[in-house]
């Protein structure tokens, strides 16, 4: 029984995921009925690029152009950090990188402030967190949150 508990704990703490803003099919997203309890798995093995192959969902949060998105990463295997990119997309396929952290993401920090450009267009958008781990197998992780941006001055 103890071995089963330890193995269960190991898988429960496996890898990392974006918790805020709440990603598609996340346990952190209110009202989701088809929760993905494997959000910490890398892409591949049934989870495709972009956004783990999940279709767009409800808007998890609204932001104003120029505002910072407070991002929280959680999980138990940060692989000694790595490289994170935070990006926005309006079509769910083409992403514009708006913030990069080299070498130290998500370790030691797990909270990030990512500013939306002031001239970013208004409308529904996809906010993506992409992570390449530093040690172990080279893996790519991605979580996407459906957001809405208001007050932008660019063209949509």
Predicted regions and their residues:
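Fungal secretory targeting signals
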Residues: 1-19
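Structured recognition/catalytic domains enriched at protein termini
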Residues: 13-156
């Amino acid at each position: 029984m103890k071995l089963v508990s330890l193995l269960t704990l190991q898988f429960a703490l496996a890898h990392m995921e974006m918790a805020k803003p709440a990603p598609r099919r996340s346990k952190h997203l209110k009202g989701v009925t088809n929760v993905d309890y494997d959000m910490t798995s890398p892409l591949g093995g049934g989870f495709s690029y972009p956004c783990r192959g999940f279709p767009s969902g409800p808007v998890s949060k609204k932001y104003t152009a120029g505002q910072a998105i407070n991002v929280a990463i959680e999980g138990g295997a940060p692989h000694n950090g790595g490289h994170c990119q935070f990006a926005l997309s309006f079509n769910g396929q083409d992403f514009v990188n708006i913030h990069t952290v080299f070498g130290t993401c998500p370790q030691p920090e797990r909270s990030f402030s990512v500013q939306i450009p002031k001239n970013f267009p208004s409308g529904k958008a996809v906010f993506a967190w992409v992570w390449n781990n530093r040690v172990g197998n080279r893996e790519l992780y991605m979580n996407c949150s459906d957001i809405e941006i208001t007050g932008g001055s660019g063209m949509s």
